[in-house]
C-alpha cells in the first residue's frame, strides 16, 4: 500500500513539475508574442489582417505550447509522445544536432515529454486552469501598454516630401518612392538609391546627382518625434546611445504607420562592415551593412533652405 501511495505522490509531483515548466514556457511565448506584435506588427489598415497576423505569427508559439500542455494533462501518454515527435521534427528542421538547437529545443522537448508521460497532476482541473490562466494573464498584462500606444498613433496619410525642422536639424525627407521604399534592403543599396535620386525625390536618374543622402545617426535621433512634437533626442557618440525627452513612435512626419518597416539605415558607419540603424522608438543599433530584411528600410534626406 505504501509503495502504491509513493507511486501516486511521485506521479503527481512529476505531473506538476511538467505543468510548471509548460506554463513557464507558454507564458514566455505569450509575453514575447504580444510585445513583438505591437512592436513590429499591427501595421495593416485591416483589423482582420492584424488579428490574423497576431494569431498565426506572433501568438502561434504560445498556442502550440498551450495546446501541448492541455493534451498532456488530459491524455498524458499521448502528450508525452507528441513532445517526442516534435523533438524529432526539430532535429529534421535544423538538419543537424547543432548545439543551440539541441540545448534550447530538442532536449527540453524530450525532457518535458518524459515528465508529461510519467506524471499525473492532480487535481487535473486545477492544472488546466494554471496552464490556461497564467499565460493569458501574462498576455493581457504585457499587452495593455503597447496596445494603448499603438491605438493612439497619429496618422495624417501624407507620404509626400516633408520639411522637418527642430532640435538643431533642418532637412527635407524624401517622399514615398525609391527614396522611401515600402520594403527594406542592405546599406549599400540604400546609399545608392539616395545618390541616384532626382531633385523631386520621385524617380532615379541615370547619373548620380548626389542631391540626396542617408541621414546621419545624429540627424535621425534629433529628428524623431511623437504626436507631431519633436522628441528632444540627443546622440551620445561616446556611449553610442540616444537619449530622448519623450519616447518617439512610428508616426508622421517621418514614419508610415501602415508600413512593415520599423528600422532605418543611417549614413553613420562604425567600420567597413557595420553601420548604425535607428528604430522608430528611437533606439540605435549597429548592424552589418549586408543585412537587408524587409523591415529594415531607409528614407533619404537633403539639405535645402527652408521654404519661405
Positions of predicted regions on the chain:
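Aromatic-anchored segments of alpha-helical transmembrane domains
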Residues: 25-32, 84-96, 137-144
